[in-house]
Amino acid sequence: LPIYNEILSRMEDSAVVPGNGRLAMTTDSFVVNPLFFPGGDIGKLSVCGTVNDLLMSGACPKYLTCGFILEEGADSGELEQIAASMAQTAREAGVTIVAGDTKVIEGKGGIYINTAGVGFVPEGLQIRASFCEEGDAVLVSGCLGDHHAAILSARMEITNSIVSDCAPLGEMVRSMQEAGVRIKAMRDVTRGGLATVLHEFAVAS
């Protein structure tokens, strides 16, 4: 599969990788229907979601692991497309997929992905929801709801121009840091929406 790289090709039971500084770690599971939607697919989504979770803590994402849970009858062609999408997105995000696993369960051809991500946080950088204060500005990176609307449209076979904004946000975060923006807290807004994120900030601070 095109997802392979030097570390994966060693086929060891664990990946030994270089690193320094403080570690940031995250894990996530991805179940989306349909597997392919305007602007992305479950493979791209799994890499972006994991990378962005690391970025939200101020980390520089470095390594990912990937576990596929396949229902019996899963389409091998679709699996290859998903793996290729993951490899491409990982390259764009500057991360390396260093370990993986596959399990097959009873079912009707579904494909699910679990990931773990590791990044390194620069010394002295602290980004936490507890740092939020009354009067802070809240910035959003784009139009809210496009991603879920694109998936729903594909699922319900509704024709429109809505495209998921699924993407690694590293460049955006680095641009703000280089511009001197004082970032207190960040979140990758997912199913809970902006309201849930703001509630989390309020409770934490």
Residue spans for each PLM region:
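Helix-biased detector of long, well-ordered alpha-helical tracts
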Residues: L1-S205
